[in-house]
Amino acid sequence: MREIKFQTYWIAGHDMLYDTNNDLEFRDKENHWITDLSDAINQPERYKVRQYTGLKDKNGVEIYEGDIDQEENGDKSVIVFLLKAGTYCVMPMDIYLNNDYQNESFFPDFIYGFGYDLFFDNCTPDKYLNIIGNIYENPDLLGGAS
């Protein structure tokens, strides 16, 4: 069974809050905090919640939804939870930025074009993924789609 963990990005403070004690109380380095996960979930205009995938990249970095992966050739992807497939996926940056990838009509074309290799169920993140940041703390990385 995978470990269930979350991170919460505080939009106004431009800071990631961590659940360091596994008590679902989230704090940052300056001790800003929220008391539980429901505070963040119920205020999406103030907080963005990221769930741990249960996997690590090739450098041992924990992989969360919203993380950015960079391949050796420089191509970037974003880790997303694809609702239609019920799994985490490595979404190519250009598709992440330019398409409604959660839309049901998009899904068949996505599978036809990329196959199932991008699904975590069918790849080995610990061998191939290289997490270089995330969409909240490193928005500058989103502009480098190739």
Question: Where are these predicted regions, by residue range?
Answer:
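Secondary-structure transition motif
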Residues: 1-146
